[in-house]
């Protein structure tokens, strides 16, 4: 059986609307949500930047005038420097959109792939400070995620 990027997207999206599935993903090593999910979009077209795989937003109940956006980019293969640049392009596009509308926000990126290979030229970039990196493996026991610190 071939595991596709869309399959990974389907698995993750189930967790956005179902606490049981979210709990399973957390046990498997992937923790993307807090209790205050506001909205999520699949295949979000970002004007002038491309299409982000998943975008989720959290709203803090104590600071309703501020939202946090997480751009989630899925890779069937390796996460590399191009993946980081692609995710940063989406982050910049969304941030500009929210800025022009006067919406207070913070924004981060999450990259998920089956391998991680980021050259040292990217490790010194400020952009990595707001990024999370996960690798996954898929076998007879299901899917497992490992978070990598940069």
Describe every region a protein language model picked out.
Residues 1-150:
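Charged, terminal alpha-helix-loop-beta segments
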């Amino acid at each position: 059986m071939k595991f596709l990027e869309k399959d990974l997207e389907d698995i993750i999206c189930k967790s956005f609307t179902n606490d049981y599935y979210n709990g399973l993903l957390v046990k498997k090593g992937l923790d993307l949500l807090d209790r205050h999910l506001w909205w999520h979009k699949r295949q979000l077209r970002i004007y002038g930047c491309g299409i982000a795989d998943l975008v989720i937003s959290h709203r803090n109940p104590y600071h309703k005038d501020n939202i946090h956006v997480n751009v989630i980019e899925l890779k069937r293969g390796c996460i590399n420097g191009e993946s980081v640049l692609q995710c940063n392009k989406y982050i910049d596009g969304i941030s500009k959109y929210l800025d022009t509308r006067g919406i207070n926000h913070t924004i981060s990126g999450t990259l998920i792939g089956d391998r991680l290979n980021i050259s040292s030229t990217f490790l010194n970039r400020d952009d990595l400070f707001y990024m999370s990196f996960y690798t996954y493996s898929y076998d007879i026991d299901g899917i497992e995620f490992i978070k990598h610190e940069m």
